[in-house]
Amino acid sequence: MKAAIKFQYSGDDTDGYEIRILAGDREAWVGGSLARNNGLGDLVRAATAIATGQWTVDMWHGEGTPCHRVRFSIVRVESNGAADQQWGVRVEVHDAAAFDRLVQPPRIDLIVPSALALAEIVYSDTAPDVT
């Protein structure tokens, strides 16, 4: 199954952004305003500053009881051996109940340039484990 993720700035909040997640015939939108504390620009800066990765940002999406939680993790990715390492971003999508029970959530792994271009990135669900 192919899936895609698209980063874009929100039209309603200049400090915010939206993430569109497509998986098969399912589509989910998450969005928020983290620019004051942990925005996308901070993710880029963290990627260049923290060599070991595992720096995470959590974001809730939903009214009242959150229906999704999104976690961004900066990780080091080996694509084709140690000589070809680059920064990657792991995106985990949780439902709130599963997250609270610490159930293993579905995981989406993607490799992006360190610039985190605000463009659609296509990946497959057979992405390598980057832990």
Q: Where are the regions a protein language model picked out?
A:
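Long protein-protein interaction modules used by eukaryotic assembly/scaffold proteins
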Residues: 71-131
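N-terminal low-complexity, intrinsically disordered segments
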Residues: 1-83, 88-96
